[in-house]
Amino acid sequence: METPLKAPESSLKPYNEPSSCTSERDVTAQELAKQGEELLAQLHRPLEPCTNKCYCKRCSFHCQLCFSKKGLGISYERKGRRRRTPRKTKTPSPSAPDKSISTRTGDSQPTKEQKKTSEATVVTTCGLGQ
């Protein structure tokens, strides 16, 4: 009778133990996750003021703030509103109350002479009814 050959137990690894390949993958995945978090932290960091005042192409792409201000021309600063000079109220001159309302505002209604001339032109234009 022959006895079957048994493999030494030390050479067989149970399935649930992590292999060296998976542990290296886990380490690289963790490093990539850390790098991604750092990049996101840098991206969401508030913009710092830049004192560069040159508008050349190189300086316009210097940082995100320079690009938004110089490259795109966007500025989120409050613009100062112009203050109007107060209007001077004019006091009516003494001759103003003597004038009638129509002469101050302009003649909006035709006078009697203008009415007569407009009626005469209407009669002449009607004519025989061609």
Swiss-Prot record:
Residues 67-77 are annotated as: Core. Disulfide bonds: none annotated. It comes from the Viruses. This is Protein Tat. It holds the Pfam family Tat. GO terms for biological process: positive regulation of viral transcription. The gene is tat. Transcriptional activator that increases RNA Pol II processivity, thereby increasing the level of full-length viral transcripts. Recognizes a hairpin structure at the 5'-LTR of the nascent viral mRNAs referred to as the transactivation responsive RNA element (TAR) and recruits the cyclin T1-CDK9 complex (P-TEFb complex) that will in turn hyperphosphorylate the RNA polymerase II to allow efficient elongation. The CDK9 component of P-TEFb and other Tat-activated kinases hyperphosphorylate the C-terminus of RNA Pol II that becomes stabilized and much more processive. The Arg-rich RNA-binding region binds the TAR RNA. This region also mediates the nuclear localization. It is found in: Host nucleus, Host nucleolus. Belongs to the lentiviruses Tat family. Residues 1-28, 77-130 are annotated as: Disordered. The phosphorylation by CDK9 does not seem to be important for transactivation function. InterPro entries: IV_Tat, Tat_dom_sf. This isolate is from a German AIDS patient (with predominantly neurological complications) who was probably infected in Mali. A motif (Nuclear localization signal, and RNA-binding (TAR)) lies at residues 78-90. It comes from Human immunodeficiency virus type 2 subtype A (isolate BEN) (HIV-2).
